[in-house]
Design a protein with these regions (language model features):
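Conserved G/P- and acidic residue-centered "switch" motifs that form tight phosphate/ATP-binding loops
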Residues: 26, 40
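Short hydrophobic/aromatic beta-strand micro-patches
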Residues: 42-44
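Catalytic core of pol beta-like nucleotidyltransferases
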Residues: 1-23, 29-35, 48-97
Length: 97
């Protein structure tokens, strides 16, 4: 699935949830994904917080939008040890303007 396709499918959902910025990383960002691959997504929630129920519903909507599993990571929840491996792969798909 192309970055443009992911962007088109997820932008309305990201907007609905008030996401400030979203980027794809991993195999999808490198063009190495397969039909069974999940989509790794890093999101910036800004100043808002999400409860567990809302977070799970958000993931469910993303997965329905793509018809794929989504591995969701928030900017604040990004592990400092994984950060150097994730940041070079980032392809921004959404920014709240």
């Amino acid at each position: 699935m192309s970055i443009a396709e992911i962007q088109k499918k997820l932008s309305p959902i990201l907007r609905d949830y008030g996401i400030k910025r979203a980027a794809v990383f991993g195999s999808a960002s490198r063009g190495e994904d397969k039909p069974e691959s999940d989509v790794d997504l890093l999101v910036d929630l800004g100043n808002q917080t999400m409860g567990m129920f809302e977070y799970m519903k958000f993931i469910e909507r993303l997965e329905q939008g793509l018809n794929r599993k989504v591995d969701l990571v928030t900017e604040k929840g990004l592990n400092k040890f994984l950060r150097p491996y994730i940041l070079p792969d980032l392809k921004v798909i959404y920014e709240d303007r």
